[in-house]
Amino acid sequence: MRGLRQGIMKQLPILEPGDKPRKATWYTLTCPGDRPCPRVGHSCSYFPPVGDAESGKIFIVGGANPNQSFSDVHTMDLGTHQWDTATREGLLPRYEHASFLPSCSPHSIWVFGGADQSGNRNCLQVMSPEDRTWSTPEVTGSPPSPRTFHTSSAAIGNQLYVFGGGERGAQPVEDVKLHVFDANTLTWSQPETHGSPPSPRHGHVMVAAGTKLFIHGGLAGDKFFDDLHCIDIGDMSWQKLGPTGAVPVGCAAHAAVAVGHHVYMFGGMTATGALNMMYKYHTEKQHWTVLQFDTSLPAGRLDHSMCVIPWPVMSTSENKDSDSVILTLQDEKGDAAEKAETQSGGPHEESPTTVLLCFVFGGMNTEGEVYDDCLVTVVD
């Protein structure tokens, strides 16, 4: 089956700063500096520019390899295209955790749960944007039990949503409650929901698009799920969806991001190996598409992490009255969307335009090879 190959792959083209990426193409980014070592279970988040900065940064938090779990934070500056170490202070080592940036403090990164070699966690930690140190704030309400819960896309506004997760080995927690953490009030709650929630699972993707949370796949014991569920936080009603199109196979340890009305899903594992396919789901039409690429595909992988980043390119305006479209990343409501502005330029004036890329870092195959590569492809 196409997409199940995980061995030696052809080298992908390199996307250089300022280059305009082509659609239906996977690229690698090769940035110098203090890059993260190969790892799995890390989180990957895009931070918008702070203060006078023109470009944002990608933050890679935690993760693990077969020998240890990490408490480091690495950043990729999208202006200088260099890696750096942000901090090693205060973060408890963890992997397969959740991360989010609340709208009340969009330059603070929160992490929840995950595990290290000694067991699962259920604590929350936050990194201050001023001094880049981590703290463990006191919270109220009943937190979820300790669990792995690997996502960077399950937040809407100030609230992180937690469903399911890993207990031990291939077994999920039996809890099917929806847990909500509010970063503004520092409170956990378990709102009453309606309908039938998904069965217990871990390794599923949970991604917010607008006011809806979508859950796909996951694992319980040796059973891989291929179902798709949705809950709208407006009425708190669970729905099991029956989408059309190229429905993905049952898988776990994959990753997903939302861009407008689309959810992009990449990678994961099945009983036969690691996947390197990308799917697009239209949340309004409830339709799946498997994306076709003009170039080689990345190596199949699982337990990687993804986020959506803006990528500036330079275009030359031949007409002073011509308009260039500028896309900006909007994640105020927990999803990435596109906002168009127009900008007029003089004859032959270079003006910046921005495209949105899905950024993928790390992961591993089912043969034990752990990756430290950076992959990108255009999403729209």
Curated annotation (Swiss-Prot):
Ranges: Kelch repeats: 57-103, 108-154, 159-211, 212-258, 262-311, 357-380
Pfam families per the UniProt record, alphabetical: Kelch_KLHDC2_KLHL20_DRC7 (PF24681)
PTM annotation: Phosphorylated on Ser residues by PIKFYVE.
Keywords: Cytoplasm, Endosome, Kelch repeat, Membrane, Phosphoprotein, Repeat
Free-text function comment from the UniProt entry: Rab9 effector required for endosome to trans-Golgi network (TGN) transport.
Claim: Zinc is one of the keywords in the record: no
Disulfide partners: none
Name listed for the protein in its UniProt record: Rab9 effector protein with kelch motifs
Assembly mode: Interacts with PIKFYVE; the interaction recruits RABEPK to the endosomal membrane. Interacts with RAB9 in its GTP-bound conformation.
UniProt key word Phosphoprotein: yes
Organism: Mus musculus
GO cellular component: endosome membrane
Location of this chain's protein in the cell: Cytoplasm; Endosome membrane
Lineage of the organism: Eukaryota, Metazoa, Chordata, Craniata, Vertebrata
PANTHER family: RAB9 EFFECTOR PROTEIN WITH KELCH MOTIFS (PTHR46647:SF1)
Superkingdom assignment: Eukaryota
